[in-house]
């Protein structure tokens, strides 16, 4: 019987083919294109470059390499490890802790295991299903004109069923399941990317709050010293009580900042503890914010191909592939399924006679089921799958456009923040010199208390603004790494 069916099976195998659309997703970034800064007026660019040059004349990069050389070395962001830009081993340890303990990341890992198990289930129908069956029974047949006849039978068989995947329905299902797994892997990488950037940003915020706290403490000590001088001069009759009250009010300003930074540091610590998967523990500090700013160098342009590394783009592309594969499943489901079923075993009236040559039973069947009328169910399912493919295609294109925008925004932000920080630093140096002169003139009786108060207020505000602009520059760099798909010690994602 098997020999007689072999030609039929061979014809079906030759005639069978995968039905469904072919899949192709265009790269979100053309080969060789770059993401670059917009043009800046020459006069403006020259001014900011002169500020930056003046600041780094006496500075050398943390790693010991001159800044100008590091610009060449780091021309491609793809070769830079995620945290190397900050040169802070404490931050690296915090990130490693978060990668081991963060609950959201552990959930993402468990979700991948779920989808991999589902993919294994999608692969199973490609193989025959084999079962062992046994039965013992009795039956009585009465024909009316003869005495009833009783039958006793014991049956043991091995049964096989196999759907021949001529139209590719099962293979499309496996492709969809594998694409789902890849999409979840990309989602996990996205969780890692967000986690690392969130830890880095939170840590930098803590460093900035530490710096604000130090500025406020130094300013408070300086103003208390000035207040003591003012009180002495009041006792000597050189100034009025109004002048003293003005100085007392000035002392309160940095005290308010101290209270604010203490509260904000506690809140930032709590937020970092959640990211680290820790309880309420103190966050260690490594380098300073100023050191991180000195070490930071970002090129003026980066390869647009780095956008291909972004987890959200990769996830959207794999979801598009999965939707396309499911459309192939829906199209193949409209074709006649071909099944091969068979069994082999033994059947006897008494169990003792099982497996005797004369009790052998077997069957082998080839079946085809042709859908003639289903009320349009299969056609509607294919239409639904086709609509989902279009949705996934548009979502992939939107993810690519959003990635391009994020990268452009982040690149502009990090360089504009650098220019802002350079201008703020120049202002602080000038105001510090102005305050020194104002104090000398006030002590010599050549300037009023208003001149001194104004110089103190201006310097304090400028120092806080400089600290915040340094944080803005560093967080913009973190945003750029996130926008480009990231990278961290060990080769990146």
Residue locations for each model-derived region?
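Periplasmic alpha-helical coiled-coil/stalk elements that build and connect Gram-negative outer-membrane
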Residues: 170, 179, 186-302, 413, ...
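A short glycine-centered flexible hinge/capping loop motif at secondary-structure junctions
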Residues: 234-238, 442-446, 483-487
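Terminal intrinsically disordered/low-complexity segments used for targeting and assembly
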Residues: 1-97, 154, 178, 262-308, ...
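Transmembrane beta-strands of outer-membrane beta-barrel pores
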Residues: 114, 136-140, 164, 276, ...
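Transmembrane beta-strands of outer-membrane beta-barrel proteins
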Residues: 131-135, 161, 339-343
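Sec/SRP-type N-terminal targeting helices
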Residues: 106-107, 123-124, 165-192, 242, ...
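Hydrophobic, lipid-facing positions within transmembrane beta-strands of outer-membrane proteins
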Residues: 154-162, 202, 302, 362-368
């Amino acid at each position: 019987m098997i020999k007689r069916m072999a030609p039929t099976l061979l014809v079906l195998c030759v005639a069978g083919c995968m039905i469904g659309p072919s899949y192709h997703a265009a790269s979100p970034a053309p080969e060789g294109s770059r993401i670059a800064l917009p043009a800046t007026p020459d006069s403006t660019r020259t001014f900011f470059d002169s500020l930056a040059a003046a600041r780094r004349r006496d500075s050398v990069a943390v790693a010991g390499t001159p800044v100008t050389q590091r610009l060449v070395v780091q021309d491609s962001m793809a070769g830079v490890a995620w945290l190397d830009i900050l040169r802070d081993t404490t931050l690296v340890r915090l990130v490693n802790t978060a990668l081991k303990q963060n609950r959201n990341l552990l959930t993402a890992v468990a979700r991948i295991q779920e989808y991999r198990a589902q993919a294994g289930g999608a692969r199973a129908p490609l193989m025959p299903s084999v079962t062992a069956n046994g039965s013992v029974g009795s039956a009585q047949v009465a024909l009316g004109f003869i005495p009833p006849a009783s039958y006793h039978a014991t049956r043991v068989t091995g049964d096989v069923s196999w759907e021949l995947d001529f139209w590719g329905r099962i293979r499309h299902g496996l492709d969809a399941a594998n694409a789902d797994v890849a999409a979840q892997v990309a989602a996990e990488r996205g969780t890692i990317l967000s986690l690392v950037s969130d830890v880095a940003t939170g840590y930098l915020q803590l460093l900035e709050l530490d710096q604000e706290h130090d500025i406020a403490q130094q300013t408070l000590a300086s103003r208390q010293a000035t207040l003591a001088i003012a009180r002495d001069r009041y006792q000597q009759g050189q100034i009025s009580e109004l002048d003293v009250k003005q100085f007392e009010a000035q002392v309160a300003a940095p005290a308010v900042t101290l209270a604010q930074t203490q509260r904000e540091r506690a809140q930032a610590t709590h937020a970092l503890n959640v990211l680290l998967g820790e309880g309420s523990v103190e966050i260690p500090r490594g380098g300073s914010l100023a050191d991180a700013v000195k070490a930071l160098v970002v090129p003026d342009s980066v390869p647009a191909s780095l956008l291909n590394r972004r987890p959200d783009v990769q996830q959207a592309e794999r979801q598009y592939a999965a939707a396309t594969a499911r459309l192939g499943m829906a199209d193949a489901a409209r074709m006649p399924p071909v099944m091969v079923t068979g069994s082999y075993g033994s059947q006897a009236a008494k169990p003792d006679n099982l497996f005797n040559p004369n009790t052998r039973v077997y069957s082998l069947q080839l079946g085809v089921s042709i859908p003639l009328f289903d009320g349009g169910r299969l056609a509607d399912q294919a239409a639904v799958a086709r609509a989902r493919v279009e949705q996934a295609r548009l979502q992939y294109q939107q993810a690519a456009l959003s990635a391009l925008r994020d990268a452009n925004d982040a690149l502009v932000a990090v360089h504009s923040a650098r220019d802002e920080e350079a201008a703020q630093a120049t202002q602080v140096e000038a105001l510090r010199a102005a305050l020194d002169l104002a104090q000398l003139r006030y002590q010599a009786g050549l300037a009023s208390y208003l001149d001194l108060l104004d110089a103190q207020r201006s310097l304090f505000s400028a120092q806080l603004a400089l600290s915040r602009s340094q944080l803005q520059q560093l967080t913009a760099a973190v945003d750029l790494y996130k926008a480009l798909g990231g990278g961290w010690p060990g080769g990146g994602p």
